[in-house]
Structure formats: structure tokens, C-alpha cells
Amino acid sequence: VINPGDESMLDAFYDYMLALDSEEEDMVFLIELPFSSRTDFSKDVVGYIAQQVEYWNNSKKPEDIVFERVDWIADYKSEEAENDASVAVANFNKLTESLVKGTDMKCSFVFNLKNTYDYDGCREWFEKALALPFHKQMVWGISDIKDYEQFGKLMAKHSNDAVSIYPPIDLDGAMEQLAEQAANEDKSD
């Protein structure tokens, strides 16, 4: 949960988490999609992640990047008719198992739901997702804005499984640190 106006800092944090040279050891997938509909969102997010996996498997990587092919194929037929979120949960459980089995790492799926208009449907979809079993090493994250929270009640209802994090994003302090770092680099040149 971030303060209003800190959206660009959150985007910068996402970029940091996804950077190849980041010290982040856990697997992180950022899903940048607005919620579409309860019936289509699972297929949308699974398709989005399938595309990311395909990019990873087929892209050229710097020599210093340890490459391991991701052997996972999206299964759009794993849907339970009564639960619209089942396709996403089942696929993400399988992908998590494939990526982090036998390690102490986590596999995180972070939903950046910018430009979502149907938050009622979105909350219902996440409610259905939370009713399904999650892989023990899988974590889901949703960004929200303080005082405009769309998921506060959902988080409270699932307080044993969910936690709200209020990161201390200090844009002014960050700018001061960048300026100080730049000044120090200029002195050393």
C-alpha cells in the first residue's frame, strides 16, 4: 500500500525487482494488466506470464547471466467451472513448483492493476483465488493506494493469509541521496 503520488516510485521498485543485476534471489513476475472480467482474467494473466516465459526462453542473454530454460506450458483447460480464478492459480502453482522446488526461494506474482475500472469484479476474482490452495512457496502481491484502497476489506477478511505492507517510500530523501551520490562521483573523477 503506497501513498498517493508515489506510483512512480512503485514502478521504479518493480523495475529494480525485475532487473537482471538485482540481488533479488526470489523469482518475481510482474503482471501489468488491468482487470478485464471475472471470466477472462485468469486466461489473460496466464497468457501474460506464458509470454514472459517465452521471452525468457528465447531471448539472448548476457554471458554472465545463468540461463535455465523454463519448462512450463500454460494449461487453459485446468479451469474449475465454479471458480473463475482456478486457471490462474493452477498454472501459477505449477510454474512455482517448476521454478523453486527444492529451494527456499519464493515465486512471487505481483499484480499491477493500473487502469482497472471494475474493482468489484476484481475483488471477487481475488476472493475466488484465495479460496483455492496456493503452493507453499508462491506469493501474490497487489499494489494499492493508501486512503483509496481497493483491497483493504479483502486483506482484512484474509488476515491469516494476507498482509498489507506500507513501504517507507521517501521521494525527497531518495532525490537527496541521488544528488549526494552524483556529487561524490564528480569529486572522484
Locate each region found by the language model.
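Intrinsically disordered, low-complexity segments enriched in charged and polar residues
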Residues: 66-78, 106, 123, 133-135, ...
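Conserved AAA+ ATPase "SRH/arginine-finger" region at the nucleotide-binding site
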Residues: 160-178, 182
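Alpha-helical bundle protein-protein interaction modules that mediate dimerization/oligomerization
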Residues: 91-99, 126-132
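Extended, compositionally biased accessory segments flanking or bridging domains
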Residues: 1-95, 102
